[in-house]
Amino acid sequence: MANTANKPNDLVKEDYDLIVIGSGCAGLTCAIQARELGLKPVILEKMETFGGNSMRASSGMNASETIVQLKHGIVEDWHDFYEETYKGGGKLNDPELLEYFASHGALAIDWLAAHGIVLDDLTITGGMSKMRTHRPKSLAPIGAFLVNNLMKRAKELEIPVVCGVKAERLLTDEKGAVCGVKTAQRNVYAKAVVLATGGFTASKDLIAKYRTDLKAYRTTNHAGATGDGIKLAEEVGAEVMQMDLVQVHPTVQQDTDHVYLIGEAVRGEGAVLVDGNGKRFVNELSTRRIVSGAITALKEKSAYLVFDSQVKKRVKAVDFYQKQGLVVEAKTLEELAKKLNVKENDLEQTLEKWNQAVEKKQDSEFGRKTGMERELNQAPYYAIHIAPAIHYTMGGLHIDKQTHVLDKSGNVISGLFACGEVCGGLHGNNRIGGNSISETIIFGRQAGMRAAAEIKK
């Protein structure tokens, strides 16, 4: 989809009902929901193109108790989703945020479907026991699919999305309520502001401040993920939380100048990880924290994702990876082993043992229980060299379940809301794959609804 966003000189109005800062899935969802409730919002985006970090999301959107799951024969309770996310986050998740999140996923899927954005295929990600990761039937990467479709709806609703405008400061009135944004072009006023600016994975200063041990790590995120919303909110007294909780994603291709995240759906559809000897070393669908730690513990501190043509067909993102030259392809396992410079017999034995585990539905080596729907036995065979990289910041602004930003005393900062990765507390010390996109839609809607309700009082 072409970039249909406005440019700074198109920002002719000085006031709106609602200013949304950030044009990823959270910001777009928030603005659409607010507009449909009668507000006149504007979206300000500092980058020259819309979509933010959401454009890089690949695997899908987690939700439980959905119609889609029932069509696939999956019956479950959202409380199980809650418990697995809570466990996956080291039980450091904010229970109130997590309960709202886990119990509103199906509504978010339905809301998207009502807007013609249908996610009717399922896969699974690490840390989940059931297929909850919703994606389009085309198997297209979730991020660009959602952003482009949400942008279409924003255009239909005549919501201005203005790129190239950086928020320099939040404006407050005499009572301390947030009432607008200072930009290089002008002051823009509104009855409320929503921060949907993403995390700080691309901020060397903030990473160095909160996680010195990760200073040398590369990031999967785009250059705009610099924690702007956190800084803006702190200037008006907002509290931050869990800022040291930074996620390292285990499967990132880093052999070129550009860093490429290899989505969790590749493992969810059956790929295995092997070390430099061609042997498995971990349950590939453990949490990202565990898998990253296992890779880092290897002598080479990297590994290979190995899969076959069946997995490739189930994950369309692999076509993109191939176009970028990231995928090693071979007609046989023997040929693949030679290309990877691993022992042929070891790789063949690894796949033979894995296929037996799939057939028996029992992984006696590492206890993997998911992503075992099909054996890896259909040539051609493929491999991608991966290593861990910074991927997500679980910490951020302290919000309540109504998406109000809170100050250091736990009080609501009037007129200020936040949604998406800019917020802390939801994920604990490890974000489950597929939960970030869910967060953007669930809490993006919530921010739009709450802002509309309070502005209309």
Regions found by a protein language model. Give the residues of each.
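Core beta-strand elements of the Rossmann-like FAD/NAD(P) dinucleotide-binding domain
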Residues: K13-Y16, A184-A192
